[in-house]
A protein has these predicted regions:
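Acidic, metal-coordinating helix/loop segments flanking the phosphotransfer/catalytic sites
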Residues: 46-72
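Receiver (REC) domain active-site loop signature in two-component systems and cognate sites
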Residues: 79
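C-terminal output helix
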Residues: 129-139
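Conserved acidic carboxylate
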Residues: 23
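Active-site residues of response regulator receiver
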Residues: 76
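Two-component/phosphorelay signaling modules centered on CheY-like receiver
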Residues: 26-53
């Protein structure tokens, strides 16, 4: 698997929601892909595209974020090259990205959650995450009713 991947969850053109998932574990990437495809099919019903991009680390994520706009970032906190904490700091320091919703996702303990919250994440999910929690968080932050 390469550093960056892209797919449109409902097969339509990329003119709707754009979500960036930053994760280095291929199995977890598959789970997010499945959940977001379900969200596109069940909640958006093909009316609004949900374009999902994947990056394996914070550096690849920043490249994508500076190349084009996104509506939501969901990031693991522990990854090689540039971890999620560093990514959150970079996002919050960029004027154009400062208000971008960021969800931190980690199996780390309370210290990881506290650190992520202090850095300015919008939301935090603890691994292992439940499908419903991912879907509810994405719906809430993208304001999907």
């Amino acid at each position: 698997m390469g550093q960056e991947q892209s797919q449109t969850a409902n097969g339509t053109s990329p003119s709707g929601y754009r979500v960036l998932i930053v994760e280095d574990n291929p199995h977890i990437i598959e789970m997010y892909s499945y959940v977001l495809k379900k969200l596109a099919a069940n909640e958006l019903k093909g009316t609004t595209p949900l374009e999902v991009h994947f990056a394996a680390d914070g550096h690849a994520a920043m490249t994508l974020l500076t190349d084009s706009p996104f509506h939501l970032v969901m990031t693991d906190l522990y990854m090689p090259v540039m971890d999620g904490f560093q990514l959150i700091e970079k996002i919050r320091s960029e004027p154009a990205l400062k208000s971008l919703p960021v969800v931190a996702i980690s199996a780390g303990g309370q210290d990881a959650k506290d650190r992520a919250m202090k850095l300015g994440v919008t939301s935090y999910l603890k691994k292992p995450v439940r499908f419903a929690d991912v879907m509810d968080t994405v719906k809430q932050l993208l304001r999907i009713t």
